[in-house]
C-alpha cells in the first residue's frame, strides 16, 4: 500500500493509474467494520482503491469534538493493508487548507445543509461538501463509496454530484451494525457501559417504526412519536431530532414514496445518529456520464 501525504504525491499516484477504474473511500480514520465494508465493495468493483484519512476541521463546530476525535493511524494502516487497499492519502490540515490562502472557495447546499443535523450543527455540511469536492477533484475516482449511516451526508453529497455534474458514481452502502443492532461508529468509543446499553434504543426505536409502518401506520407524526417514546423509555433525554422524511429528497414525508426515519441523540458522551428506510424503494447510486 502506497503512502500519499500531500497533493503532489496523490496527483502523481493518480497519473500512474491512467484509465483504470478507481474506487475512493473518504474517511476520518478510527476505522471499523463499517469502513472496511466500503473498502471491500470498492475492491470488488474497481481496479484500484484509494482511501483517505483526514479529520476535517471545517465540519466541526467551535464546541464540538475535533481535538478529541479518536486518531488511530497505525491501527488504521494495518487494517487497510490487510484488506488490500492500494493507496492511503493522509494529508495534514495545511496540505488541504493552505494557510497562505485563508479565503478558499466553499461549497454549500442551502436546502439540504440547513435541516436536521445541519440545523443543530451550523456549517457542518458546508465543510463536508467542500472537502469532499476537493478530494474528488484530486483523486478523480470512477466511484466513491459512502456509508448510509450518515444518511443526510449521503443525500447532500449525491445532490452535489448531480448539481455540479461531477464525473463520479456515488455509491451508498447499507449501515453495518453490531450484533445488538447499534450502528457502528467511531464515536461509539465514547460510550461507557451504561451509555452503551442505552444506545441500542436507537435501533430498537427504528425497528418499532418499521413494524408499525408495515402494519399500516403511515402517519409521520405518529411514527416519529413511537421512536421518541422508545428513546425516552431508555433514559435518553437529549434528543436533537426524530424526523420522518422522504427518502430521496429529505423533505417532510407526505405519505407518498419511501419514508426514512432519522435520529440524532446524545447518549452519554456521544452524539449518535441512525436511520432506517421504511419503504421498499431502494436508494439509487448516481452516475454522471
Swiss-Prot record:
Keywords: ATP-binding, Cytoplasm, Ligase, Nucleotide-binding, Pantothenate biosynthesis. One of its GO terms (molecular function) is ATP binding. One of its GO terms (biological process) is pantothenate biosynthetic process. It catalyses: (R)-pantoate + beta-alanine + ATP = (R)-pantothenate + AMP + diphosphate + H(+). GO terms for cellular component: cytosol. Beta-alanine binds at residue 59. It holds the Pfam family Pantoate_ligase. Pathway: Cofactor biosynthesis; (R)-pantothenate biosynthesis; (R)-pantothenate from (R)-pantoate and beta-alanine: step 1/1. It is found in: Cytoplasm. Its EC number is 6.3.2.1. ATP binds at residues 28-35, 147-150, 176, 184-187. (R)-pantoate binds at residues 59, 153. InterPro entries: Cyt_trans-like (IPR004821), Pantoate_ligase (IPR003721), Pantoate_ligase_C (IPR042176), Rossmann-like_a/b/a_fold (IPR014729). The active site is at 35 (proton donor). Its main location: cytoplasm. NCBIfam families: cyt_tran_rel, panC. Belongs to the pantothenate synthetase family. Homodimer. HAMAP family: PanC. The reaction proceeds by a bi uni uni bi ping pong mechanism. Catalyzes the condensation of pantoate with beta-alanine in an ATP-dependent reaction via a pantoyl-adenylate intermediate. This is Pantothenate synthetase. It comes from Magnetococcus marinus (strain ATCC BAA-1437 / JCM 17883 / MC-1).
Amino acid at each position: 500500500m502506497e503512502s500519499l501525504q500531500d497533493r503532489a504525491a496523490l496527483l502523481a499516484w493518480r497519473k500512474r493509474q491512467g484509465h483504470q477504474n478507481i474506487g475512493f473511500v473518504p474517511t476520518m480514520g478510527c476505522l471499523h467494520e463499517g469502513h472496511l465494508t466500503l473498502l471491500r465493495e470498492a475492491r470488488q468493483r474497481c481496479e484500484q482503491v484509494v482511501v483517505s484519512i483526514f479529520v476535517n476541521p471545517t465540519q466541526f463546530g467551535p464546541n464540538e469534538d475535533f481535538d478529541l476525535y479518536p486518531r488511530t493511524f497505525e491501527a488504521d494502516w494495518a487494517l487497510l493493508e490487510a484488506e488490500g487497499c492500494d493507496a492511503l492519502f493522509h494529508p495534514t490540515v495545511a496540505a488541504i487548507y493552505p494557510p497562505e490562502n485563508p479565503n478558499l472557495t466553499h461549497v454549500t447546499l442551502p436546502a439540504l445543509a440547513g435541516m436536521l443535523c445541519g440545523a443543530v450543527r451550523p456549517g457542518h455540511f458546508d465543510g463536508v461538501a467542500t472537502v469532499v469536492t476537493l478530494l474528488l477533484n484530486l483523486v478523480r475516482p470512477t466511484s466513491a463509496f459512502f456509508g448510509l449511516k450518515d444518511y443526510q451526508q449521503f443525500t447532500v453529497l449525491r445532490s452535489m454530484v448531480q448539481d455540479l455534474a461531477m464525473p463520479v458514481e456515488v455509491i451508498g452502502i447499507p449501515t453495518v451494525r453490531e450484533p445488538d443492532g447499534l450502528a457502528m461508529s467511531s464515536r461509539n468509543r465514547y460510550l461507557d457501559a451504561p451509555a452503551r446499553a442505552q444506545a441500542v434504543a436507537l435501533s430498537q426505536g427504528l425497528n418499532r417504526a418499521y413494524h408499525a409502518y408495515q402494519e399500516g401506520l403511515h402517519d409521520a407524526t405518529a411514527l416519529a412519536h413511537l421512536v421518541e417514546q422508545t428513546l425516552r423509555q431508555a433514559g435518553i433525554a437529549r434528543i436533537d431530532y426524530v424526523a420522518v422524511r422522504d427518502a430521496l429528497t429529505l423533505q417532510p414525508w407526505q405519505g407518498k414514496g419511501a419514508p426514512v426515519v432519522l435520529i440524532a441523540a446524545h447518549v452519554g458522551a456521544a452524539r449518535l445518529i441512525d436511520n432506517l428506510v421504511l419503504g421498499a424503494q431502494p436508494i439509487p447510486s448516481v452516475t454522471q456520464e
